[in-house]
Amino acid sequence: MAFFKAAVFLVCVVLAAAGSASKSKRALVGGWKTQDPTNPKFENLAHYAVSTQVEGREYYDTVLELLEVQTQIVAGVNYKLKFTTTQSTCKIETGVEYSKELCQPKTNKVEAVCTAVIYTVPWQNIKRVLSYNCEAPNDV
């Protein structure tokens, strides 16, 4: 009987240790999770973010390359996107609505590295830019 109790105790200890080890590898609930930046959905969100940045600009910027993507589940989804930008061929004041197909880069020279956080609630058709910050490419 003592052997049986010792065996059950040992199994419990091993299972508890295995459970705590696997928890450390899981993403924190509500935390940021790294995603694959080659997913076209994320590129579209980056283009959406640049399309909202018009104040004080003559031309829209456009996305050159998506560098990093993170997602966070909240009451919807937050997307944190890091990408490079340059000026596009689309003048803002002409009334042309931004699109990644129409607003091509004037050059392939990186003018800024930007980070945008976009909040979406798909089932309520909500999408908005919570923050948008850019730095010179050599500052990153």
What are these regions (language model features)?
Residues 2-140:
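N- and C-terminal low-complexity/disordered segments
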